[in-house]
């Protein structure tokens, strides 16, 4: 076996193990020792391929976001936000470890993350905003409402939702429960943005 191929297989094994541990216990709860002991990987092998725990975590987050974007790009999102939310939820159900990695930065304070993680988070946010704007472009907006207004409103409500749920992240609620709350709330927010909350008079 070529050395380069062996190295790639080794890194993939380490990443798979790290995704499981970070995806289960979070950055703070997971340790390199856990990864080594549970998955029968030597610590020397990990530090030969990754500088430290931070770099390993960044690679896991990058993989989670890359896989999410790749999955979502298989579908065409037009004016149906429910279809978009269905596919988001489907991905998170299929890949619970990726789900936890992604939501660990959605529902946490940006200040705790390295610049590299912030860049990955921004890539995730930009991708989702682009889908939102693609849907908006196929709708007839109310008079006086611009694309920029729609985007600003969406961003504001999204940030408020994340801030609100990040407080629950510090409570005794399970992380899976928080993810479920986030996705259900986001679906409602998108519905409110598009169709409002008041029934028009006949």
Protein language model annotation of sequence segments:
Residues 62-68:
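Short, basic, alpha-helical segments at the C-terminal edge of helix-turn-helix-like DNA-binding modules
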Residues 69, 112-140, 148-152, 162-163, ...:
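Amphipathic alpha-helical packing segments from all-alpha helical-bundle domains
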Residues 90, 129-134, 156, 163-202:
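C-terminal peripheral helix-coil segments that are non-catalytic and often amphipathic
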Residues 93-115, 163-171:
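Amphipathic alpha-helical segments used for helix-helix packing
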